[in-house]
Amino acid sequence: MAATSKKAKKLSASNPVTAAKLPSKPKKSSKKAVLVSSKLSYKGKVFSVFTDTVIEPTGVTNVRDVIRHNGSVVILAVDESKNPKDPEIIFERQYRHAAGQFLYELPAGRVEPNEAPLAAAKREMIEETGFRAKRWTLLTKYFASPGFLGEWMQIYLARDIREGTSQPEADEEIEVFRVRLSEAMALIAANKIHDGKTLIGLMLYDAARRAGKL
């Protein structure tokens, strides 16, 4: 599944994780909410908060606070050179102030304005871990918390990796290490991984491998 230099391949539509049968004609209306007004309530370095007045599909007028974010990328970097059946995953450990604790995570970061997601993934992997990859596959993309957060997260699989020197930002102190896939899945089963993007990426990757899609 080699990718071109400009684009990452995607998992096929036959992937068992993504090809579940959905109703072709939903029983409920597909009508969207109508935006009446939108006011910028807060603008920070990473995101903005808008207070939106909307008419819901039910006809009810509602006021919603919505966080707008440029989107993020997650990198599931794997080293299959030593043991293709149980490859090594590049992991990070870092302190997260909002969570108030150290977390085990996959490398990730935000997409800068006018930056392509794949370019952001390559940049973030170099900055945080020093690794580069020859093959890139888009595993999935999803909304992080769609009730109030308009942020797409895109998970990329990076293969044929080679190690280099990381270039972390001044406020980042990241420990980088390797974990075998079997060990990572055992950590999930033991409730030791508390980061959502990492859980989604690892479980999707493991399921796709078991189904012979990767």
Enumerate the language-model features and the residues they cover:
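Nudix hydrolase/Nudix homology domain
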Residues: 2-28, 33, 102, 113, ...
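Conserved Nudix-box catalytic region and its N-terminal flanking loop in Nudix hydrolases
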Residues: 11, 22, 30-33, 64-67, ...
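Acidic, metal-coordinating catalytic segment for phosphate/diphosphate chemistry
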Residues: 37-76, 80
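Acidic pyrophosphate-coordinating catalytic loop
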Residues: 40-44, 97, 142-152, 210
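Short beta-strand micro-motifs in enzyme catalytic cores
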Residues: 48-52, 88, 102, 152-154, ...
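Short loop segments at secondary-structure junctions
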Residues: 58, 79-83, 95, 158-163, ...
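Unchanged
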Residues: 62, 73-74, 109-196
